Structures are given as structure tokens and as C-alpha cells.
């Protein structure tokens, strides 16, 4: 590879990491395209808590920009951040709608969580947790995340749908034909499958940027189907238009003000029991979702050292902690490291230049939101499904000849898609690893911190 001599080389150490400006930018675009859905989904979820939808969109983009820049600067890793899925739903539907708290109080809980994270990062507690997890279990986390994001892609494209009898099932084209919905949800399933096959072909052919090209190919097919009448948008059934909404003319490109949200934190309930419960729930999910993502993506990118440790992890964890605190002030739920970063890593992203590219695109999205919000779930699904495959290959590195290693790894892997949570997968893996190895008399393999984690996980299931 020709050595980069630019300012970017000096800042991001591109040659040292075996990459180039072109590769990093392409990787950043790919990561952003796979996570751009958050710009549409987060406002929809947070508005259910009574928050201004336009303001949430702007705050989401700014939080994504800020967090991802911090990741690039603090750690020089290709990981992107944004308000986390799952945590936003917990914020809106559990804390606000079910528990009856205001969104201002919920933001205060997120802020306090972020401050605690900063302290934990400064005192190396989060880094110690990362290093305490055994290497085989780290590989299992990577494989489990692969299944998890594949499942996200399959359900997002409605290839897999809910079924009252079997919980989930394949999409039924016959039922869609009979119900007259083939041109809404049915055709999008076809397009998603075509996108997966096209992306897989590009991967086999070793075409650079294959994941990004797969997204664009599927999106363009969707546009062609819509303009020819083969695809008929029906938002009530999750079938949205693939065309940018420019009905407001130039005003369509103006970002909404975040004044209804910024600084609106209510600490009046901070001493109550329920506030502590909410805070602990945010803490648990964010700590282990972030650690799981860092473990999985860095393992796939061969960033871990011989002992399974991630160099410069302290900077990555600090970026995540500061971003959460700042995001709460901006008016969004917990800002966290995105598993979709794996898409950019699969495209060759290895440094903070990938993250910086994502950050720039978050800012551009403020002014080009009609285009980014038009990227449909069926177009990003092929990226998630194929990246899921790439991450699942980490399973080949697990020692399945040792049952004390293999069974906890297996439980961690299957828990992630079935529980729809990276954190729960880590929880299952840690608890089973400690119990099985203790009963097998192999306590020398278990670090003291693993025992502590296992007890905390068990208490979490009892108390939260």
C-alpha cells in the first residue's frame, strides 16, 4: 500500500493500521448508511414520550456527531456512536409512559448515568471488566452479535415476522397476495432478498465497498419499483416511501431547533427509589451493550492483542461516557457505540478517520435529512444480514473441545438474538461460565472480577 503522507496519515496513523484515506472514507459512509435509520426511528420513539419530533431529529444528529468525533479523537478507532436503540424505547415506553415520570426526569437519569460512566472509565473499572472476560467468551460475543444484527436485518425487512402460534415465522407471500398487500410489504421482502444476494455476489467477487453498493442497489431498485407502481408505500403497514420528501421546498433542508429539549433536565426525583431503579437499568444495559459491541467488532477486525485486550480501550470508553452525558443535555436518551460499526470495519475501516467520516455525515444529515430518512429498512437489511455473517465467523475460533468453554459460549451466542439484547448475551455467558467452571473444579480459570460480575448479573435478574 502506498504510504499516506498527508495530515490525515499523521493524525490517524493510516499506514501503520494497513489502511488508506479512500478505504476509511468508504468504510465511514458504509457505517453511516447502515445506522442512518436512527435519524428516522429515534424521533418516532421519543415523540411517544411527548418530546418534539423535529427537535429530537436534530439532537440525535448532533449527539451522533459529538460522540463519534470523541471516539475518533480519544481512541482512533472506527466506531460510531448515536442514541441507542432499545434504550430509547425503555426511556419512552417504560420510564415515561409506564412508570409515569416526565421525559425531563428520564433525561436527568441518563445524565447521572453518564457521569457515573465517566468516573468508572477514569478509574479503569470498565476496562477491567473488558479484560476479565475470557478470550473464548469474547469470540462468542462477536458471533452472537452477528446473529443479533442479522435478526435485526431480517425483521426490519419483514423477511421474518411475528406469528402468534410460533412466535416468529417467514413472511408469507401467499397471505400477502390474498390480503392485497404484496405491493406494499411483499415487494419489499423480495427487494431485500435480492439485495442480500447482490451483496453476497459482490463479496464473493471481492468488490470493494460491497456492503455500501448493496445498500444503494437495493434502494435504487425500491425507487424504480415505486415510480412504476410495483411498490405502493403504506406507512400503516411499515412500507414507507423510498423517495425524499421535498414538499416544503428549501425549507425541507432546514434543521429543526433543539431549544425545546436542550438543558431540560429535572433532578427533583433523584433521591427516590424508582429513580435509582431507572438509573441502574440504564447503567446495566449501556455498560454491557457497549462492552459487547467493542468486544465483537474489535475481535472481528483483529484489533485485540494476544491476551484478548483492546489497546486504547480507555479512550473508547471515555468517548462513550462523555457522549452519554452530553447527549442527555442535548435531549436524547443514552448515546452508545453502535454495532453497525461492524459494517464499516468489514469494508476495511481501522482508524478514527472512519469514525470522523461518520461524524461529518451526521452533520450533513441535518441539511440532507429528506434523503437519509428515505433510506428504507429493506435497503439496509442486506448490509445487516451480510455483516452478521461476517461477524458470526468468529465462532470458528472458539474451542469447542472444552465443554467448560463451549457451553457458556453457546449460551451467550443464542441469548443475544433470542433475548434481543447484547447485554443479556454477556450476562448468560458470564453466569454460566462461572457456575460451570466452578462445578468442574476449574476455578483457576476464573478471575475474581468474573465472580463479582456473575453475582451482579444474578442480582439484576432478582431486583430489576
Model-derived regions: residue spans:
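Helix-loop-helix hairpins and the membrane-proximal interhelical loops
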Residues: 2-55, 174, 215-313, 455-459
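Helix-loop-helix junctions within the multi-pass membrane cores of secondary transporters/permeases
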Residues: 3-42, 63, 84-93, 97-145, ...
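Alpha-helical membrane-protein architecture signal
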Residues: 18, 22, 194, 276-280, ...
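Hydrophobic/aromatic residues within the transmembrane alpha-helices of Major Facilitator Superfamily
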Residues: 29-36, 69, 73, 150, ...
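Helix-coil boundary and interhelical linker segments in multi-pass alpha-helical membrane proteins
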Residues: 44-55, 94-105, 273-276, 376, ...
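Loop-to-helix transition at the N-terminal end of transmembrane alpha-helices
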Residues: 50-69
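Juxtamembrane transmembrane-helix boundary signature
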Residues: 64-85, 116
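Membrane-embedded alpha-helical modules
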Residues: 99-220, 356-464
Amino acid at each position: 500500500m502506498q504510504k499516506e503522507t498527508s495530515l490525515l496519515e499523521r493524525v490517524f496513523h493510516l499506514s501503520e493500521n494497513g489502511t488508506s484515506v479512500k478505504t476509511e472514507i468508504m468504510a465511514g459512509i458504509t457505517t453511516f448508511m447502515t445506522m442512518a435509520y436512527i435519524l428516522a426511528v429515534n424521533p418516532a420513539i421519543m415523540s411517544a414520550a411527548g418530546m418534539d419530533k423535529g427537535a429530537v431529529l436534530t439532537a440525535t444528529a448532533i449527539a451522533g456527531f459529538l460522540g463519534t468525533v470523541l471516539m475518533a479523537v480519544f481512541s482512533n478507532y472506527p466506531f460510531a456512536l448515536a442514541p441507542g436503540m432499545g434504550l430509547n424505547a425503555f426511556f419512552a415506553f417504560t420510564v415515561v409512559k409506564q412508570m409515569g415520570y416526565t421525559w425531563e426526569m428520564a433525561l436527568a437519569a441518563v445524565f447521572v448515568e453518564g457521569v457515573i460512566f465517566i468516573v468508572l472509565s477514569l478509574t479503569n473499572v470498565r476496562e477491567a471488566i473488558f479484560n476479565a472476560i475470557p478470550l473464548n467468551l469474547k469470540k462468542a460475543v462477536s458471533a452472537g452479535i452477528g446473529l443479533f444484527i442479522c435478526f435485526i436485518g431480517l425483521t426490519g425487512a419483514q423477511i421474518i415476522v411475528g406469528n402468534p402460534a410460533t412466535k416468529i415465522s417467514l413472511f408469507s407471500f401467499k397471505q400477502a397476495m390474498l390480503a392485497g398487500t404484496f405491493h406494499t410489504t411483499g415487494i419489499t421482502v423480495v427487494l431485500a432478498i435480492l439485495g442480500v444476494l447482490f451483496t453476497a455476489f459482490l463479496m464473493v467477487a471481492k468488490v470493494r465497498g460491497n456492503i455500501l453498493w448493496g445498500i444503494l442497489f437495493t434502494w435504487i431498485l425500491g425507487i424504480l419499483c415505486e415510480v412504476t407502481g410495483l411498490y405502493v408505500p403504506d406507512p400503516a403497514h411499515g412500507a414507507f416511501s423510498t423517495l425524499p420528501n421535498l414538499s416544503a421546498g428549501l425549507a425541507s433542508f432546514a434543521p429543526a431547533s433543539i431549544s425545546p429539549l436542550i438543558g431540560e433536565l429535572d433532578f427533583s426525583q433523584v433521591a427516590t427509589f424508582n429513580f435509582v431503579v431507572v438509573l441502574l437499568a440504564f447503567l446495566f444495559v449501556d455498560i454491557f451493550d457497549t462492552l459487547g459491541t467493542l468486544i465483537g467488532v474489535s475481535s472481528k477486525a483483529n484489533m485485540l492483542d494476544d491476551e484478548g485486550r483492546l489497546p486504547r480501550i480507555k479512550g473508547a470508553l471515555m468517548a462513550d461516557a462523555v457522549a452519554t452525558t452530553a447527549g442527555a443535555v442535548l435531549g436524547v436518551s443514552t448515546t452508545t457505540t453502535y454495532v453497525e460499526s461492524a459494517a464499516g470495519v468489514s469494508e476495511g475501516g481501522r482508524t478514527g478517520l472512519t469514525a470522523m467520516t461518520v461524524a461529518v455525515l451526521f452533520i450533513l444529515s441535518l441539511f440532507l435529512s429528506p434523503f437519509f430518512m428515505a433510506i428504507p429498512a429493506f435497503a439496509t437489511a442486506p448490509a445487516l444480514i451480510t455483516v452478521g455473517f461476517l461477524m458470526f465467523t468468529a465462532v470458528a475460533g472458539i474451542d469447542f473441545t472444552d465443554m467448560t468453554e463451549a457451553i457458556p459460549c453457546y449460551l451467550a451466542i443464542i441469548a443475544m438474538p433470542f433475548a434481543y439484547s447484547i447485554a443479556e448475551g454477556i450476562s448468560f455467558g458470564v453466569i454460566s461460565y462461572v457456575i460451570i467452571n466452578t462445578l468442574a473444579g476449574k476455578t483457576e480459570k476464573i478471575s475474581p472480577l468474573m465472580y463479582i460480575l456473575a453475582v451482579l448479573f444474578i442480582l439484576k435478574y432478582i431486583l430489576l
